[in-house]
Amino acid sequence: MAKHNDFGRHSEIMAQNYLRSLGYTILETNWRSGHKEIDIIAKDENIIVFVEVKSRTNDIFAKPEDAVNFKKIKNIVRAANTYLISHNIESDSRFDIITLLLMPSGEYKIEHIKDAFIAPLGI
């Protein structure tokens, strides 16, 4: 596996552990609907949370969350709708982004952006 894939996978595991430490229940990881993928599907009390994980080794050119563009949002929302329908879930849901930034010290800075975006109309 390429080094950047290892970094991304490690970041997703760290994000899962972070969510668990906050009391979330992890329902799915890397859930796919066709070519669309949701990194983490979790439950926060009675809310289904669809989480996009973005990690970077630096933020010189852009912040990790800047990689979640409109096309990515559309794909996440479509996959989330498929998940909710296929699992017959009618509870509230939201879309979060967790960013991990590798600091020069080797530590990670984790940021959790709740309700990072809403589903665009017509999707």
Go through each PLM region and give its residues.
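Acidic-basic catalytic patches of nuclease active cores, encompassing PD-(D/E)XK
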Residues: 1-29
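Conserved catalytic cores of phosphodiester-cleaving nucleases, focusing on short active-site segments
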Residues: 19, 38-60, 76
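Short, glycine/acidic-enriched loop or turn micro-motifs at the edges of active sites
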Residues: 31-33, 55, 99
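Short acidic/glycine-enriched loop/turn segments that link adjacent beta-strands
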Residues: 33-36, 106
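Domain-level recognition of nuclease-like catalytic cores that cleave nucleotide substrates
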Residues: 86-123
